[in-house]
Structure formats: C-alpha cells, structure tokens
C-alpha cells in the first residue's frame, strides 16, 4: 500500500493498494459519519454491494444511488435525483458521499456533495484508470450543459481517495488506453520518467504486475503537487489542461461519444503541432508525442473538414480570457508555457497537420 499526501487548505491522502473497501469504511467512520450514499453506475452493482457490506460491518448505514453511465449521468437532472435521495434519508452535515465509478461519477458525486448543505464530505473510489489519475484527485467537480462540458461546477476537495488496483483487472482494453492519455500527459508536463517507461515497454504500462502501479503513483504525485499550490486554477494548475482545449472541443463536436482520454490524446497532438510550428519544440519532441501515444493505441489524428465547428467550441472554452483561446504548450519535455495569441491561420495550420497524420 502506498499513500500520497495532497497538501493545501484541506489536506487529504490518496491511498493506492489492493482490497481497500475496509479502509474506505474506516475512513468514513473516522469522519464521524453515520451513513453514506454510494453514487455509482449500473455496471458496478455487485461491487457497490461489497462496499455496503464493509460499511455495515462497522455499524454504519449505506445507500446505493445508481446513475446512468458516463456523461449521460452528469447533468442537473441526475444531480437533482441524488439530492432527493439525500433528503429522504435525512442526510446531515456529518454524513458522507462516496463515489464508486469512473470520472463522470466522480465529478457528479463531488458536485452533489459540494452543494448539499453547502458542502459535505466526499470520498472517491475511482474504478477506471482515467478517474484514478484524473477526476478523483484535485477537488474539481462538475456537470455538463448543452453549452459545454463541466461549465457548472464547484471546487470541493475530497476527504480521501482510494485507488484499488484490483479494479484494473476488470477494465476492458479501451478503458486502459483512454486512461493512459492522462498519465502520458503528466509525463510531458512534469515527470519525464513516465515517458521513458512507456518507451521502454508499452505493454508493461497496462499491467498491474508491470509498470502500471508506478505510473499511477507518479501521475497522481504530479497532480498532487500542482493542485496543492493552486486549488482554484488561478495559475500553475493550468498545466494540467495540456491537450484539453482542443480535446474538449472534440468531445463537444462528437457529442461526448469519444472517450475523454482519446480526445486529450488528439488535443496533445494539436497543441504539439502548434508549438512545433512556432519553433517552441523540436521535431523530435513532436514525434515523441506521436510515437508514445500511438504505441498504446491512442489516436493521433483527426479528420479534416470540421475546423469551423471545433474553432467555435474552443472560443467557448472556460479557460479563455478576454475572448482569446488559451493553450498550455511545451517548450521542452517537462517544461510548459502558455499560448494566448494564436491566430486563426496558426490554428488551421495545426489542424491540417493533425489531418495529415501528424507529419
């Protein structure tokens, strides 16, 4: 078992290990909660029952709230249904929300907890690789609207995060591939050892008996360091958005049918092309993006003919300032910069590079 501290105004621990449900229940008890609401997805039904058993073994009560899968469960109507259950169960300020699922469930559960009685505790138990290294750590919560992804939300740090490596054995390859994008992202912005591990043996990077536990720990440690210094994304935390400006536009264009990691992968290729065209990074670093991402099955291209729609989506990105599209870019492996003055012609050139297969 490994523990990573996330410092800041409300410090908490990220626990990485095996068979952690008893630890989750113990954490809930230490918070003084009498009951928990486990917000989860249909596919996690039997797993949720096991977590209920661990909680009830300590004399506490647990209620399962099942929400629709993926982004279909991340909207105001679903949040309202969750609050209705909390009301019927007379949830008080000492009680706890537990997320058990992927990133969408993590985001939703955090938002539900942030709003109920102006904020109650939430514990995250992420079950996908993506949520383990992304949504579960950092305190961002949110739901989607027709205007875009995560435009309604709050900053609400969890009281604890439990990454149970046993969950990974049940994941289909497509989930492992998508989650790898966020791990690789942290390699490009901060911890280049991550990149070296993927280059050394991509297959071992999917394996709990191989490099995957180290990759998860390294990625979480990067995010923990960044968010500890900038909870509300006022400055340094923005580096975690590497690949996300174009990536979120792709998700919106594809009506959220693309997996988040796949969209971020294409987003990293887009901004790497933008940086290379400006002379900020070398051809070698640009190709390193393409080689590492493609080695694990992530997309590195996007079809032509959609720039106008993607451009409009980027213009609505919540990271923009004064009407300018803002990108996190690299000036070297592990070194970031902001691009805030890219004109339409530059963006078209980067997009055309993406269309041509990144050459």
UniProtKB/Swiss-Prot annotation:
It comes from the Bacteria. Its cofactor is NAD(+); Co(2+); Zn(2+). InterPro entries: Dehydroquinate_synthase (IPR050071), DHQ_synth_AroB (IPR016037), DHQ_synth_fam (IPR030963), DHQS/DOIS_N (IPR030960), DHQS_C (IPR056179). It is an enzyme of class 4 (lyase). One of its GO terms (molecular function) is nucleotide binding. GO terms for cellular component: cytoplasm. The keyword Amino-acid biosynthesis applies. Binds 1 divalent metal cation per subunit. Can use either Co(2+) or Zn(2+). GO terms for biological process: amino acid biosynthetic process; aromatic amino acid family biosynthetic process; chorismate biosynthetic process. NAD(+) binds at residues 69-74, 103-107, 127-128, 140, 149. Its EC number is 4.2.3.4. Its main location: cytoplasm. It catalyses: 7-phospho-2-dehydro-3-deoxy-D-arabino-heptonate = 3-dehydroquinate + phosphate. Pathway: Metabolic intermediate biosynthesis; chorismate biosynthesis; chorismate from D-erythrose 4-phosphate and phosphoenolpyruvate: step 2/7. NCBIfam families: aroB. Belongs to the sugar phosphate cyclases superfamily. Dehydroquinate synthase family. This is 3-dehydroquinate synthase. It comes from Corynebacterium pseudotuberculosis (strain C231).
């Amino acid at each position: 078992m490994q523990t990573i501290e996330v410092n800041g105004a409300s410090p908490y621990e990220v626990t990485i290990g095996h068979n952690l449900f008893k630890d989750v229940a113990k954490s809930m008890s230490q918070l003084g909660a009498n009951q928990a609401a486990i917000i989860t997805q249909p596919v996690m039904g039997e797993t949720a029952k096991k977590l209920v058993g661990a909680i009830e073994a300590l004399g506490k009560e647990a209620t399962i709230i099942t929400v629709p899968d993926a982004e279909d469960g991340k909207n105001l109507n679903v949040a309202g249904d969750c609050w209705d259950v909390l009301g019927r169960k007379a949830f008080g300020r000492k009680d706890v929300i537990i997320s058990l699922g992927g990133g969408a469930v993590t985001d939703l559960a955090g938002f539900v907890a942030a709003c109920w009685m102006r904020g109650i505790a939430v514990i995250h138990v992420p079950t996908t690789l993506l949520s383990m290294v992304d949504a579960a750590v950092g305190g961002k919560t949110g739901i989607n609207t027709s205007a875009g992804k995560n435009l309604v939300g709050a900053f609400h740090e969890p009281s604890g995060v439990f990454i149970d490596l046993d969950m990974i054995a049940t994941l289909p390859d497509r989930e492992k591939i998508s989650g790898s994008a966020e791990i690789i992202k942290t390699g490009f912005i901060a911890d280049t050892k991550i990149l070296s591990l993927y280059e050394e043996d991509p297959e071992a990077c999917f394996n709990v008996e191989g490099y995957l536990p180290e990759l998860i720990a390294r990625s979480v440690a990067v995010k923990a360091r960044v968010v500890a210094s900038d909870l509300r994304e006022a400055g340094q935390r923005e580096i975690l958005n590497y690949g996300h400006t174009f990536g979120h536009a792709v998700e919106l264009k594809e009506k959220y049918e693309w997996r988040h990691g796949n969209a971020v992968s294409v987003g990293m290729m887009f901004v790497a092309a933008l940086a290379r065209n400006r002379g900020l990074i070398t051809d070698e670093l640009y190709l390193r993006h393409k080689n590492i991402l493609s080695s694990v099955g992530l997309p590195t291209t996007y079809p032509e003919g959609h720039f106008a729609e993607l451009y409009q989506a980027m213009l609505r990105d919540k990271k923009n300032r004064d009407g300018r599209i803002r990108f996190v870019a690299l000036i070297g492996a592990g070194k970031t910069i902001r691009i805030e003055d890219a004109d339409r012609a530059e963006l078209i050139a980067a997009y055309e590079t993406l269309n041509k297969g990144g050459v």
